Amino acid sequence: DPADLEVLVEKEIVTVDLKQLALLTLYVDYQVREPEERAEDIYLYFSHYAFHDLHIEDMFHAGRENLTETEQFWNDWISLLKTKSGDTESRLLKEAVLYREGIEGLVKMANDNYKVHPSLYLEAMNEYDKNYGYSQIEKIGENAIEKIDSKLIIRSKIALKAACASSYLNHTEKLMLFCWESFRSDSTVRNLLRLFATREMAEQYGIRAEKALASRIKGNPITSIRNYELNQNIINN
């Protein structure tokens, strides 16, 4: 049982390279399962701590023999992860799509699957950011804020990322709009203050946002819970 082994390693009763052992476990499981069973069975291992941070593509290089029928596995793997929410699932889906289809494929996946994995938009933006693709980031941001529920906190993060891209492009109007949308989805004091960065922004959005925040605090003083992927999908009260 992987969970039992984790306890033994944690208590220093045995010394094992858990990552390598976990990869070998996936590698062997892949070999012994029928092709149509592999994706579902391998996915179950990721409920164990030792598997959380594994990259599925490393599984293919864990043993001496090349794994076969990989095309079906990747298709089944992506189809499965599209239906599963959570931090680990989102990461695995991102990595699988990037590995198979590149950034454009990741953007398409975000467009098709934003209700389950809205964070894929942000992941695609981060990939474009590595090569200073500010125009692509801005375009993704515009699309994302139209699609994603305005009450989801992940939408605020996406809007803020797009605002940074707009600042590099000197697109002032879009910068201000993204900052406003960021505030709408996560009405923190920090996001409010950002709307007062310039006189023009304060006049268009800042004063309106200040009134909205004051009204919200008065009506609901309880701070909403904020976490990462799982809580980014929680709609605020």
Locate each region found by the language model.
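Eukaryote-biased, non-catalytic alpha-solenoid scaffold regions
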Residues: 1-237
